[in-house]
């Protein structure tokens, strides 16, 4: 069996690569200015990528599990990198349609496959701490904008939009390939009551299969709370940079730095909240998310204070990241 901490490092490597999608807001204004696209046209690219992330993760999850983490990781790399190179081409000819196709659809499929691959693998190495393992696996996805935000802002300023995507594509090709080649599922063990988590025991004792679970009211409830939590965070992530520039008069460089800080809280929220949920409970943790977000969004709409505005954004993002980590656990 491979070292589980190196497996965790490989998982983080995959997620840091695809998680750069969270820094999209840094590119919003440059794309609008250089390409002549509207704000809604530009942000729809991000929305489409996130939509495809969810769809591909949902419909290709069993396929990724079947072919194994190494092959599914490499497949995610091919889609994501192809999406980035295609985006560079789309921007070079000022094509909004191709931008949607390459970044939104093709890149989005890579996001979905790349998202579930390390999560399902790493949880198997930490059978008694599923919340911690999930948070550890997707921590890189949240932290990615810490690196990608300032990096994209620098690349766009010095080499232009098109070359920015080419450089990112080459970088992620290397990182994702190396990470995928190390990923390997652990050797299966015969489950015992001492090494089974409660959810696994329930499946064995009650015979609850995926198709059966989807027919229950609990599944519908989980889907809706997950949807609401994602919507709260995505709305901020897609507009974080231009929103802070307009609302509290941040410079583009400062806004890019804030996007990086958002990455810290996004990633930190994933590992912190998921670990807390191992002891506090998943349902109770989600209730706390909603209480925090309701209060934070209300105050956010009323405040004109720059510090308060930024603190509230970061608080909401921790809940957003934590929701992603708690749900798979």
Language-model segment annotations:
Residues 15-16, 83, 96-113, 227, ...:
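Hydrophobic core of transmembrane alpha-helices in multi-pass small-molecule transporters
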Residues 22, 50-58, 146, 263-271, ...:
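Residue-level signature of mid-helix packing/kink "hotspots" within the transmembrane helices
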Residues 24-29, 211-275, 328:
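Extracytoplasmic gate region of multi-pass secondary transporters
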Residues 31, 112-126, 133-134, 322-329:
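Intracellular juxtamembrane helix-capping segments at the cytosolic ends
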Residues 56-69, 270-281:
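Helix-to-loop junctions at the C-terminal end of transmembrane segments
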Residues 78-93, 292-304:
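C-terminal ends and interior cores of transmembrane alpha-helices
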Residues 141-188:
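Helix-loop-helix hairpin linking two adjacent transmembrane segments in secondary transporters
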């Amino acid at each position: 069996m491979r070292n589980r901490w190196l497996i965790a490092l490989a998982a983080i490597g995959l997620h840091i690569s695809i998680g750069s999608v969270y820094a999209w807001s840094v590119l919003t204004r440059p794309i609008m200015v250089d390409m002549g696209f509207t704000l809604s046209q530009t942000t729809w690219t991000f929305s489409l990528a996130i939509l495809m992330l969810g769809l591909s993760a949902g419909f290709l999850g069993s396929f990724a599990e079947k072919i194994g983490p190494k092959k599914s990781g490499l497949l995610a790399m091919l889609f994501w990198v192809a999406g980035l190179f295609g985006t560079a081409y789309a921007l070079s000819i000022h094509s909004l349609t191709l931008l949607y196709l390459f970044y939104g659809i093709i890149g989005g499929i890579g996001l979905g496959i790349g998202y579930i691959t390390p999560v399902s693998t790493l949880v198997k190495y930490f059978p008694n701490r599923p919340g911690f393992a999930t948070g550890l696996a997707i921590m890189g996805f949240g932290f990615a904008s810490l690196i990608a935000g300032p990096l994209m802002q620098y690349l766009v300023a010095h080499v232009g939009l098109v070359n920015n995507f080419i450089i990112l594509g080459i970088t992620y090709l290397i990182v994702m390939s190396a990470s995928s080649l190390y990923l390997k599922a652990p050797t299966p063990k015969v489950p015992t009551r001492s090494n089974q988590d409660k959810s696994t025991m329930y499946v064995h004792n009650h015979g609850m299969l995926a198709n059966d679970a989807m027919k229950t009211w609990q599944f519908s409830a989980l889907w809706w709370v997950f949807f609401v939590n994602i919507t709260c965070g995505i709305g901020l992530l897609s507009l974080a940079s231009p929103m802070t520039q307009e609302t509290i008069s941040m410079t583009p460089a400062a806004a890019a730095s804030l996007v990086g800080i958002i990455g810290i809280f996004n990633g930190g929220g994933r590992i912190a909240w998921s670990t807390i949920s191992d002891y506090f409970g998943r349902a109770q943790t989600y209730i706390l998310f909603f209480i925090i977000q309701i209060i934070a969004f209300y105050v956010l709409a009323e405040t004109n204070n720059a510090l308060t505005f930024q603190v509230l954004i970061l608080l909401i993002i921790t809940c957003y990241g934590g929701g992603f980590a708690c749900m798979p656990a």
